[in-house]
């Protein structure tokens, strides 16, 4: 059991690491010919094709109830359309630093929604873990002096990034039972199919005027990474965790993204890794550990059948 749990945590870490790399790579791609709406289209269409191909080549042929097909539509709106559109367009307007700061709100919003809709207890460990993780993430983001000095924020972009976090938090909270009923590939192929149908009518003009021949090969490589690694593979890994873990734990791994950004910054010579960065990383991992150790609603019911006292 511990080995299986460890594997799930590793997948969550890998997914968030891919999303951490997506911000600088996606921002660079949008600075060299790929518009924000075009990148959203590539992500939706590319991932839909990948998941359908995986379904056809593998053993993922599942019958989906008509009601669940409708539910997949709404799940796709929250997890893909609102989340990806708002974040990608927001990233094109604001700085990667501001976008990263806004992502730290996801665990907080998810904890509140899980308490309201799933009756998950807001325990001391959970609150302390989220607080430690947020402080660590903010230290990493704001400690990147080069990015902080050269990144210009934009209120509209920041609000779009915040909307993306809120929509994904609602998705994590409301659709957990639906996701548990089907394989990851079945869930994703329908969600991305619906997302593609909704997105393309609004983005096809951007695709039509895209200067395909003038876009450098490096930009296409960055776009391919965003589509295949940060969308297709990352969603597979994230969904595996969503099926087994509580929503707040899944969202806590969002704090891994600033760590990846810090590593990239140091590797490219744009940042340094000192004691403050080391302390920030420890705070992030300590926060994630505290949340994973916090007791769920089921745990508290087992310990106190007559009541649930959120003290740990």
Map each language-model feature to its residues.
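Transmembrane alpha-helices of multi-pass small-molecule transport proteins
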Residues: 31-82, 109-110, 167-174, 188-207, ...
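Hydrophobic/aromatic residues within transmembrane alpha-helices
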Residues: 29, 39, 43, 90, ...
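Transmembrane alpha-helical segments that form core, pore/gating elements
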Residues: 24-27, 51, 110-112, 116, ...
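Hydrophobic transmembrane alpha-helices of multi-pass small-molecule transport proteins
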Residues: 51, 113, 122-144, 199, ...
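Single conserved hydrophobic/aromatic residue that forms the stacking wall/gate
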Residues: 1-5, 9
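Specific transmembrane alpha-helical segments of multi-pass solute transporters/efflux pumps
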Residues: 18-23, 52-103, 139, 227-245
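Juxtamembrane helix-entry segments on the extracytoplasmic side of multipass membrane proteins
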Residues: 6-7, 32-41, 64-70, 142-167, ...
